[in-house]
Amino acid sequence: MSLPDKAFPVSWDQFHRDARALAWRIAGLDREWRAIVAITRGGLVPAAIICRELGIRLIEIVCIASYHDYTSQGEMQVLKGIGASLLENQGEGVIVVDDLTDTGKTAAIVREMMPRAHFATVYAKPKGRPLIDTFVTEVSQDTWIYFPWDMGFTYQEPIAGGKRG
């Protein structure tokens, strides 16, 4: 499989550094946080890192699926909502975390549930950017990000093609 023209492969090390950078930015806001809501599945890894860095123990998930073929999003469906206690005060004091905002459709659904929550993503694309309060890296809309959990190691043919010298 070849990468698209605007591919952005992210290693585990790079993602960890970027998620910690996001935690630093959130810490710089100097606010009290009561919980993190991770948007599954992409928000699980950065949420774990941010929880650790900020000392937040209460973690919730919201699961929103868009049925797609990895080139276009389909209809959005909430598969698992957010617990009532975190919806109090419209999500005030809650950080909503995802790996990426692309079109902003997922963030818009969660923003309706929690309009006063703080939305944070590691990466942002221009269409989704207005819905996000804090992010680390912006990429163009036509860039495809390959996250480390989507990639695996594969055998690489030797440069010499197996010839012995």
Curated annotation (Swiss-Prot):
Broadest EC class assigned to this enzyme: transferase
Task: Give the matching Gene3D superfamilies.
Answer: 3.40.50.2020
Quote the record's binding site residues for 5-phospho-alpha-D-ribose 1-diphosphate. R41, G42, D98, D99, L100, T101, D102, T103, G104, K105, T106
Is the keyword S-adenosyl-L-methionine in the record? no
What is the topology of this protein in the membrane according to its UniProt annotation? Answer: Peripheral membrane protein
Annotated residues for binding of xanthine: D102, I145
Localisation: Cell inner membrane
Keywords of the record: Cell inner membrane, Cell membrane, Glycosyltransferase, Magnesium, Membrane, Metal-binding, Purine salvage, Transferase
Which GO terms are recorded in the biological process aspect for this UniProt protein? GMP salvage; purine ribonucleoside salvage; XMP salvage
Annotated catalysed reactions = GMP + diphosphate = guanine + 5-phospho-alpha-D-ribose 1-diphosphate; XMP + diphosphate = xanthine + 5-phospho-alpha-D-ribose 1-diphosphate; IMP + diphosphate = hypoxanthine + 5-phospho-alpha-D-ribose 1-diphosphate
Q: Name one GO molecular function term.
A: hypoxanthine phosphoribosyltransferase activity
Q: Which domain of life is it from?
A: Bacteria
Q: Where does GMP bind?
A: D102, T103, G104, K105, T106, W144, I145
Q: Identify which cofactors the protein needs according to its UniProt entry.
A: Mg(2+)
| Entry GO CC | plasma membrane
Q: What is its main location?
A: membrane
**Which annotated residues bind guanine?**
D102, I145
Pathway in which this enzyme or protein is active: Purine metabolism; GMP biosynthesis via salvage pathway; GMP from guanine: step 1/1; Purine metabolism; XMP biosynthesis via salvage pathway; XMP from xanthine: step 1/1
Q: What is its EC number?
A: 2.4.2.-, 2.4.2.22
Subunit text: Homotetramer.
Per the similarity annotation, which family is this?
A: Belongs to the purine/pyrimidine phosphoribosyltransferase family. XGPT subfamily.
Q: What function does this protein fulfil?
A: Purine salvage pathway enzyme that catalyzes the transfer of the ribosyl-5-phosphate group from 5-phospho-alpha-D-ribose 1-diphosphate (PRPP) to the N9 position of the 6-oxopurines guanine and xanthine to form the corresponding ribonucleotides GMP (guanosine 5'-monophosphate) and XMP (xanthosine 5'-monophosphate), with the release of PPi. To a lesser extent, also acts on hypoxanthine.
Please state what the protein is called: Xanthine-guanine phosphoribosyltransferase
Q: Which organism is it from?
A: Brucella suis (strain ATCC 23445 / NCTC 10510)
**Taxonomic lineage from the root:** Bacteria, Pseudomonadati, Pseudomonadota, Alphaproteobacteria, Hyphomicrobiales
